[in-house]
A protein has these predicted regions:
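Short, structured beta-strand/loop micro-motifs enriched in basic residues and often containing a Trp
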Residues: 5-16
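Short, compositionally biased
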Residues: 41-58
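Short, compact, well-ordered microdomains
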Residues: 57-88
Length: 88
């Protein structure tokens, strides 16, 4: 059985006027498999479909191969995250 690729999630931008209630800052990076508990649950909820698409061989239309960009659903914060598939 093939090994699953790693998934890295990085906060790349904040568009809202209010800081993140979870304390995330631009530049924070997380290994999804080992650090997902550190991620905001709302952001994780939005990230799950993209993670599954990338991890299992799919691609997200309009995004570079192996990546996806999404926003957290907090309208006052609007953190923008980048998901990257990392092949070992």
């Amino acid at each position: 059985m093939a090994k699953r690729p790693k998934i890295q999630i990085t906060l790349i931008e904040r568009k809202g006027p209010v800081g993140c209630h979870r304390g995330h800052k631009v530049g924070d990076t997380y290994d999804f498999d080992t650090e997902r508990g550190k991620l905001c649950p709302m952001a994780c909820h939005v990230a799950f479909p993209y993670i599954d698409i990338l991890r299992y061989g799919g691609s997200v239309p309009g995004q570079p191969e192996g990546t996806a960009v999404f926003c957290c659903p907090d309208v006052e914060t609007i953190n923008v995250f980048k998901i990257e598939k990392i092949e070992d």
